[in-house]
Amino acid sequence: EMQRSLVGSEMCIRDSVYTEGTDKRILESAHRLTQEGILGVVLLGKPEEVKAAAKAGNFNIDACQIIDPENYEGIDAMVAEMVKLRKGKMTDEQVRAALSKSNYFGTMLVKMGGADCLLGGATYSTADTVRPALQLIKTKPGNNIVSSCFILVRGDEKIAMGDCAINIDPSEDDLVEIAIESAKTAKIFGIDPKVAMLSYSTLGSGKGPSVTKVANATKKIKEAAPELAVEGEIQFDASVSPEVAEVKCPGSPVAGQANTFIFPDINAANIGYKIASRLGGYTAVGPCLL
């Protein structure tokens, strides 16, 4: 369903590369996407191993393309391009070694137009999935930072949380960009974004540098994206509970019904999405790099 959202979005996603081609969850997803004609799928791995894993799980991957990074006919061009992108930080030999790993290979495949997006993290750590993208794919025009958000799903309900993975202690201006880009991502996944700029304070009820940072960022967001529904600084309970919102933030178009949550730093964000996932029954999808 999340992949379907991407295909129907303005991002024009048509082909997706999966870095862990033998993982059961990946193969199940590839089977469904290709059988339903939703998306073209590229699976990375040794063909015999990928096919054996698919057969063991009774998944039909006949419509998928399988690429072995260690036996790719276009590897020389890929090496040359990656050496150029790394600007002297890696030798030819180091680049070839990196590209033998599916996380780097998949990222370069996207960079060179062989796929529109990459999905990884089934067995790779978040750091190992994100690092190649940070090194090889630059920010889009107008963006100053790379950030991230998670989409959390529970039944038919979807919410977004950012930045849970990249920026440790974002500045006011960083928070502005994180909020605006997270809202855009939320919209892609079918969420009508109502953005809560989270804090331990609601509209001046508390004091401190973090409160000031979030409050100032909220003002800047309203100036930069006046069409975006945003409230802050605001406590979490006031952002989701209509009863609390009526007391702490009356008349707000966001308070009590927020669905896109921007945290003041990575400590709060990472803890927050994991609490939602482990105790709240949400499935976390991400991090989506913005």
What annotation goes with each model-predicted range?
Residues 14-25, 165-176, 205:
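Short, glycine-rich nucleotide/cofactor-binding loops
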